[in-house]
């Protein structure tokens, strides 16, 4: 993101004849190595095994609906965290038109999808539909802070603030560790 902003700023500086060359007009992947671990999609059998494990685990059972929704929709974590009570249960659709993010310095903020294909409607399978119904019911009438015009986020922390990707990254990492300790066939990094 920083590189994109700097590149745009230098492009304008070139247009205004303030500088001759754009020092940020290079492909970042030529300079930095992508050291993120490869993500693997779970097989249907692995998904069932993970959900069964979570349902029977004293620590992680409270996350079962969240995992069902994540696995059943393929939402990005920030899109998932941005879900509000404004769901189309009649047509069983999840409309994706924003994502919830949090910056350590500036706090929570909403971002719209970067491309047209990011705006989409995701059909609710029966398990996802039932999980969302339970989440809305268990959430009750709690009101949450308004973030860039959005309120009533579905997934809240104990203090009433919305959960963000980092909250789930830690939970999922620890869940997978525990699952893999107890099963012969470990799950891949997801």
Describe the role of every protein-language-model region.
Residues 1-12, 27, 124:
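Non-catalytic DNA-binding core/recognition domains of DNA-processing enzymes
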Residues 3, 40-42, 79-81, 163-168, ...:
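Gram-positive cell-envelope targeting signals
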Residues 6-10, 80, 172-173, 190:
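Short, basic/aromatic-rich helical patch in the C-terminal catalytic core of site-specific tyrosine
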Residues 6-14, 132-135, 175, 179:
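Hydrophobic recognition helices of helix-based DNA-binding modules
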Residues 15, 19-77, 81, 90, ...:
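Basic, Lys/Arg- and aromatic-enriched nucleic-acid-binding interface segment
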Residues 29, 82-140:
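Conserved tyrosine-mediated DNA breakage-rejoining catalytic core shared by Y-recombinases
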Residues 52-63, 73, 122, 138-153, ...:
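Short, basic (Lys/Arg/His-rich) helix/loop patches that form interaction surfaces
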